[in-house]
């Protein structure tokens, strides 16, 4: 009897510890390092010219009118599912907040709800997600909505507004697991709209470094999962120019190993854009050499900072040269992977000459020549299984209705931003390790584990109670 009782107690003690073990596993998932998260990414896709769209000419500013202003349909869960099914395991969601925030940085509730819905769909599909502040930066002028400029005077004047904006975003998503990453700003330009490297020198660099530090401090202060969320900071105009890389200062952080640096590199610009050299459409050794130099520089940059570096945007325009585009993509992705750099292809949803689109969001079909070159040469990654779609929500119904009522706008509107740099295109127009496998559980899995743990604990206590009664009865019989 004594031997049986001891064995039973040991067993029940082990069972009682199970929920603690489960909780510890969940904790580990929620605090993966930046390096672990980047390692788990295979290849990413940009939901371009959608939530980042804007228009000073839009009379009735609503989430639907802005989302479709640059010619793309309203985003649906089916689109996000198609991205996952084609082999991507990460998505970058560019968002322009300017037309939905007041001067104090307070965000309109309907816009925040729409952004959250797209983020939810992406996470439910098992994707890693990057959420950013997009055309609140970039070129500024009469027809723009940019209010963040890379100079210290502007930084000081918008300091509180920027902090308030990121406080609002961070509070909205503070309980989301760490598959969601925040990117502080897209492409900060100096007062002269100078691409690649600033014309104003140290003042612009100091401003970028200040925005980066304020972003990190603001998000961390909101607590919750934001205390250890992996945060992304970009260089001046997200440029990979060597002078820009040299001037970048990584923000200080309250936790270690939770920062990522991002650049955008359409290299070489003469080949990737008709704005560079419209006659240069053949992939050649010059392209290879420039890509080699880019990846080598970024690898050294990553080593200097001590953080992973990602390429948040890259791509090549359609210049009726799909075979050469595919060769470029395959070489670019291969060299990036060899240097430990993960990439996100820019897709503006448009496929005509001079555009970057590879995914038709109306028919849910891909330019297979380009996408096969991308997916087949990307390293393997990992993602959680997609969650079953819930019943259609009111927001989805509104979105679908909007898609029908704005069809005419979608056909006639094609707002195009033009730039003259390798840092930014015309925006309008996988090694799997044990850690990454464990990281990719969604919150539904956590809930199930806790329920199981609770049932086990309850059963254990019942067992102990019955054992106690049995022992007491034996003693009384004696």
Give a label for each model feature.
Residues 25-90:
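N-terminal carbohydrate-binding accessory modules
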Residues 18-30, 436-446, 466-472:
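Sec-dependent signal peptide cleavage junction
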Residues 285-379:
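Substrate-binding cleft of secreted/luminal carbohydrate-active enzymes
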Residues 73-96, 294-302, 335, 339-344:
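Catalytic domains of carbohydrate-active enzymes, especially glycoside hydrolases
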Residues 454-478:
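C-terminal membrane-anchoring or membrane-association module
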Residues 70-91, 101-135, 139-184, 207-223:
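An active-site-proximal structural segment forming one wall of the substrate-binding cleft
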Residues 385-444:
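C-terminal low-complexity, Ser/Thr- and acidic/Pro-rich disordered "stalk" regions positioned immediately N-terminal
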Residues 156-277, 296-317, 338-341:
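Active-site region of glycoside hydrolase catalytic domains
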């Amino acid at each position: 009897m004594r031997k049986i009782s001891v064995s039973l107690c040991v067993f029940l003690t082990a069972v009682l510890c199970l929920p603690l073990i489960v909780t510890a596993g969940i904790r580990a998932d929620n605090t993966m390092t930046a390096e672990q998260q980047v390692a788990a990414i295979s290849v990413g896709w940009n939901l371009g010219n959608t939530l980042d769209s804007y228009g000073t000419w839009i009379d009735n500013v609503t989430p639907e009118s802005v989302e479709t202003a640059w010619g793309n349909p309203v985003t649906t869960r089916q689109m996000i599912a198609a991205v996952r099914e084609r082999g991507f395991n990460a998505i970058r969601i560019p968002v322009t907040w300017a037309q939905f925030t007041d001067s104090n940085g307070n965000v309109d509730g309907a816009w925040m709800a729409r952004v959250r819905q797209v983020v939810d769909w992406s996470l439910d599909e098992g994707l890693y997600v990057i959420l950013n502040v997009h055309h609140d930066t970039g070129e500024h002028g009469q027809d723009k909505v940019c209010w963040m400029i890379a100079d210290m005077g502007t930084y000081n004047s918008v300091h509180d507004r920027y902090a308030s904006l990121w406080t609002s975003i961070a509070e909205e998503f503070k309980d989301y697991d760490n598959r969601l990453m925040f990117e502080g700003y897209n492409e900060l330009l100096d007062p002269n709209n100078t691409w690649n490297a600033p014309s104003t020198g140290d003042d612009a660099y100091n401003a970028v470094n200040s925005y980066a530090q304020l972003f990190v401090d603001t998000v961390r202060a909101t607590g919750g999962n934001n205390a250890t969320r992996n945060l992304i900071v970009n260089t001046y105009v997200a440029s990979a120019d060597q002078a820009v890389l040299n001037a970048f200062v990584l923000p200080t952080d309250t936790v270690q190993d939770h920062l990522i640096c991002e650049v955008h590199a359409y290299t070489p610009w003469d080949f990737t854009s008709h704005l560079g050299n419209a006659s240069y459409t053949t992939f050649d050794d010059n392209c290879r050499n420039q890509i080699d130099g880019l990846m080598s520089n970024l690898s050294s940059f990553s080593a200097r900072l001590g953080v992973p570096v990602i390429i948040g945007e890259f791509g090549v325009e359609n210049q009726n040269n799909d075979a050469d585009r595919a060769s470029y993509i395959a070489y670019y992705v291969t060299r990036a992977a060899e240097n430990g750099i993960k990439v996100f292809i820019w897709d503006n949803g448009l496929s005509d000459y001079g555009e970057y689109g590879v995914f038709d969001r109306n028919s849910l079909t891909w330019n297979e020549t380009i996408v096969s070159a991308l997916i087949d040469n990307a390293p393997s990654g990992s993602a959680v299984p997609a969650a079953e779609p819930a019943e259609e929500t009111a927001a989805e119904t509104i979105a679908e209705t909007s898609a029908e009522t704005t069809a005419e706008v979608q056909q006639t509107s094609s707002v195009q931003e033009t730039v003259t740099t390798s840092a930014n295109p015309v925006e309008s127009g996988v090694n799997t390790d044990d850690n990454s496998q464990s990281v990719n559980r969604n919150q539904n899995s956590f809930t199930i584990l806790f329920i199981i743990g609770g049932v086990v604990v309850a059963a254990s206590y019942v067992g102990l109670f019955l054992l106690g009664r049995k022992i007491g009865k034996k003693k009384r019989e004696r």
